[in-house]
Amino acid sequence: MKKTELLIKSREAMMSAVQLYNNPQITFKSETFITLAIIAWTYLLHAFYANEGIDYRYFHNKGKKKVYDKTKHGAYKHWELERCLDCQDSPIDSITASNLKFLIGIRHEIEHQMTKKIDASISAKLQACSILSLIHISEPTRRVVIS
């Protein structure tokens, strides 16, 4: 994907997360927000790494040759958000990374079991996630902004 397309998708995923969270007819708010927010942050960091010329695809070495890992449908496997955050070149500060890793943990719970009503207990983390996303995608002094 092109860097610009990744940025657009990142922004739209976060906007969708906020819109769904604020919809009074939706009860699956936090879970949906977290899933879309993780996609948004992943695309944002993929755009950053692409801009920096950092290969964010999984691979293994076969002799001296680099062999890229692929999905069962033949697409390259790209780093998930936690791997993006753990990269030494990540532009994300430790507080934002900690917030995102907290949400990644909850996303794992969402994926593997039904969650109880969690909206009230994590709403501050969700607000921080969306605000930090806006800051990182638009603030010109941040390294993550793609030029």
Feature annotation, model-predicted:
Residues 135-146:
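Single conserved hydrophobic/aromatic residue that forms the stacking wall/gate
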